[in-house]
């Protein structure tokens, strides 16, 4: 599973101060021109949304289960980004996971017996100097990751169960797992006249978003042209996730902006999408 700082979650990797991709040349550079738009939330005039159009108009897609997915840990391509447990962001996140686990049968979850056993499916770990729960690792990957050879196939047991039930995966997975590869952050900003406004930012969750350890990932999908092959742009393919993060009216406004930008022509195309053409 994956995790992110904004949700109070992160992987633990050995730091690399240079922040250079492990496989230079296979992923685009981390720094490139981006195109942004800012607009006010139709439901909240005190919330300003800053959206990364370069990312939202990219053709990124999850390539888990295909040869294009190399895995974030060397030698474990079948794990995708699930080699490490996912830190839970808050009590609501844990409650959602606990409720989801109750829906999993032995046919859904390869390690159900282990997960419901003495050690459970969560473990305490330290993040930012505080103890925090995360999904437990079992056999070198997240305990919810079904491995190759399992009857229903490899992949996240929570995700596959959600699809089986016909519900959005975000309703059964930890926050960070369904939010990736969107980086969502919020901060209060003081304007020149002294008034404050809540600024919400949506952008790419790239290697730098993992902190100094991001450079030590064996591979990461957002910068690889092999992952920019969707027929839809990201603002369309992840409409459900963006709606959950921003609200229905704000997403509708964002969608209208993206459509208009497509008609006018985006200036800063994501380099991975450009290379994939």
From Swiss-Prot:
The UniProt function text for this chain reads:
Essential for maintaining intracellular redox homeostasis.
Q: Which family does it belong to?
A: Belongs to the Rv0495c family.
Q: What is this protein called?
A: Probable redox regulatory protein ML2435
Q: What is the lineage of its organism?
A: Bacteria, Bacillati, Actinomycetota, Actinomycetes, Mycobacteriales
């Amino acid at each position: 599973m994956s995790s992110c700082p904004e949700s109070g979650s992160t992987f633990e990797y050995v730091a690399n101060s240079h922040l250079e991709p492990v496989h230079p040349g296979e992923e685009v550079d981390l720094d490139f021109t981006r195109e942004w738009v800012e607009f006010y939330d139709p439901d909240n005039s005190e919330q300003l949304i800053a959206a990364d159009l370069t990312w939202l108009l990219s053709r990124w897609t999850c390539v888990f289960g295909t040869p294009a997915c190399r895995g974030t840990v060397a030698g474990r391509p079948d794990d995708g980004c699930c080699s490490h447990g996912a830190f839970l962001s808050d009590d609501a996140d844990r409650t959602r996971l606990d409720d989801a686990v109750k829906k999993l049968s032995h046919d859904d979850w390869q390690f159900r017996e282990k997960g419901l056993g003495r050690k459970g499916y969560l473990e305490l770990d330290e993040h930012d100097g505080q103890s925090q729960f995360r999904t437990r690792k079992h056999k070198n990957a997240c305990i919810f990751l079904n491995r190759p050879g399992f009857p229903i196939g490899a992949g996240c047991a929570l995700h596959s169960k959600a699809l089986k039930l016909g519900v959005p995966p975000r309703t059964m997975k930890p926050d960070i797992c369904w939010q990736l590869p969107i980086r969502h952050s919020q901060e209060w900003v003081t304007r020149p006249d002294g008034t404050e406004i809540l600024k919400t930012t949506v952008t790419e969750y790239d290697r730098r978003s993992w902190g100094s350890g991001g450079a030590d990932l064996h591979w990461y999908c957002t910068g690889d042209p092999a992952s920019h092959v969707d027929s839809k742009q990201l603002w369309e393919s992840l409409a459900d996730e963006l709606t959950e993060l921003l609200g229905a009216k704000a997403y509708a406004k964002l969608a209208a902006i993206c459509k208009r930008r497509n008609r006018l022509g985006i200036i800063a195309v994501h380099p991975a999408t450009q290379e994939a053409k």
